[in-house]
Design a protein with these regions (language model features):
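Phosphate-binding/switch region of NTP-binding enzymes
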Residues: 154-226
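Charged helix-capping and loop-helix junction motifs
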Residues: 144-152
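Conserved inter-motif catalytic segment of the P-loop NTP-binding fold
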Residues: 56, 67, 75-141
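Hydrophobic/aromatic ligand-binding patch that stacks against planar heteroaromatic rings
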Residues: 71, 92, 156
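Detector for small/aliphatic-rich hydrophobic stretches
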Residues: 1-81, 95, 215, 226
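Hydrophobic/aromatic beta-strand patches that form the interior of the parallel beta-sheet core
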Residues: 51-53, 80-82, 104-106, 165, ...
Length: 226
């Protein structure tokens, strides 16, 4: 039943009966921007779900976030980046293919404000993607505060059919994440050119699926180029 028709009906029902939401289609995927990863994930990150990407320094977290934002905006969809440590560089983002006009860049002052920003963004139901970048993770106090927020954020993402992706150094959302990827840095790439010395081109990394709630994956690892 459409919400506009359901609300008048709810007013006549006993207290405690609330307006619910249907979950987003579980077969819908949001491309990650990496062909090798999308083949493993059968199309990309699940829409309407909370997904988690974690890894140490130089593991490719930022690169994957930029690829995801670039792939989303290239499809003429709108995304939001909640940048908890104010590390996003718009010039690098543009060079990575992100259409900045389709990205809402939010720079909260602390973790508490970042959480509130995510709740507001998911409540708009106008976005295809929300990336919550917690950079180097959370303090023990903040982690305890967020532990009760993950089920709420997962529910909001499902209600709005928004892909919510958490980026952090360590795993935080646990079983509330429908998809969890572990990133590990690999070897440095030094392509050789005929007329000059080798130039550093980045660090290759690998993504491993450590949790996938929906469906059985035949492959669980993917190589990610810089």
């Amino acid at each position: 039943m459409p919400p506009a028709l359901a609300r008048p009906l709810l007013s006549s029902l006993p207290k405690g009966v609330t307006l619910g939401y249907t979950r987003g289609r579980t077969d819908e995927r949001l491309p990650s921007g990496s062909d090798s990863l999308d083949r493993v994930l059968r199309g990309g990150f699940p829409r309407g779900r909370l997904s988690e990407v974690f890894g140490g320094a130089s593991s490719g977290r930022t690169s994957l976030a930029c690829r995801l934002l670039a792939a989303t905006t290239a499809r003429a969809e709108t995304a939001a980046l909640v940048d908890c440590r104010d590390r996003f560089d718009p010039r690098c983002g543009r060079a990575a293919g992100i259409r900045l006009a389709r990205v809402l860049w939010v720079r909260p002052h602390d973790e508490r404000e970042a959480l509130r920003c995510c709740e507001i963004l998911l409540g708009t139901e106008r976005l295809a993607l929300v990336v919550l970048d917690l950079a180097d993770g959370l303090s023990p106090i903040a982690a305890a505060r967020f532990s009760s927020a993950w089920p709420r954020l997962a529910h909001q993402a499902a209600a709005a059919n928004v892909t919510l992706v958490l980026i952090s150094r360590e795993r935080l959302a646990g079983s509330f994440a429908a998809l969890c990827l572990a990133l590990r840095g690999g070897h440095a790439l030094w392509p050789r050119h005929a007329l000059c010395a080798p130039l550093f081109a980045g660090i290759a990394s690998r993504a491993e699926v450590v949790r996938a709630r929906e469906g059985t994956l035949t492959r669980r690892q993917a190589a990610l180029s810089p």
